[in-house]
């Protein structure tokens, strides 16, 4: 009976350790992907807004005095962002 109890306890311990390690790995992957996406979005927003303030493909994103963006651009925080 002692052997069976010891085997059951060891099996549960191994399962808990395995589960914790797998959860840690998944959490680490989620953090890495989230940070990568946030960086990409920030870079894209900066690139689009900076390009839009100057000109994109030789034409301004917004016509003079217009508040709406055109040609696949969308206004976000007073900048044109490529959709």
UniProtKB/Swiss-Prot annotation:
How far does the signal peptide extend, from start to end residue?
1-23
Domain of life the protein comes from:
Eukaryota
Q: Which GO terms describe its molecular function?
A: ion channel regulator activity; toxin activity
Cystines in this chain:
48-61, 52-75, 69-80
Residue ranges of the propeptide: 24-44
- Describe its function: Probable ion channel inhibitor.
Coarse class of the protein's main subcellular location: secreted
The record ties this protein, via SUPFAM superfamilies, to: omega toxin-like
State a GO cellular component annotated for this protein.
extracellular region
Kindly provide the name given to this protein in its UniProt entry: U3-theraphotoxin-Cg1a
**What lineage does UniProt assign to this protein's organism?**
Eukaryota, Metazoa, Ecdysozoa, Arthropoda, Chelicerata
Q: How is it modified after translation?
A: Contains 3 disulfide bonds. Two different connectivities are observed in similar proteins (C1-C3, C2-C5, C4-C6 or C1-C4, C2-C5, C3-C6).
Q: Could you say which tissues express the protein in this record?
A: Expressed by the venom gland.
Task: Name the keywords, alphabetized.
Answer: Disulfide bond, Ion channel impairing toxin, Knottin, Secreted, Signal, Toxin
Recorded family membership: Belongs to the neurotoxin 12 (Hwtx-2) family. 03 (juruin) subfamily.
In which compartments does the protein localize?
A: Secreted
């Amino acid at each position: 009976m002692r052997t069976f109890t010891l085997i059951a306890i060891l099996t549960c311990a191994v399962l808990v350790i395995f589960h914790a390690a797998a959860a840690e790995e998944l959490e680490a992957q989620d953090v890495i992907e989230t940070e990568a996406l946030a960086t990409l979005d920030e870079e894209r927003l900066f690139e689009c807004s900076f390009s839009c303030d100057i000109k994109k493909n030789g034409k301004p994103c917004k016509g003079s005095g217009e508040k709406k963006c055109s040609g696949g651009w969308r206004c976000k925080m007073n900048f044109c962002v490529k959709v």
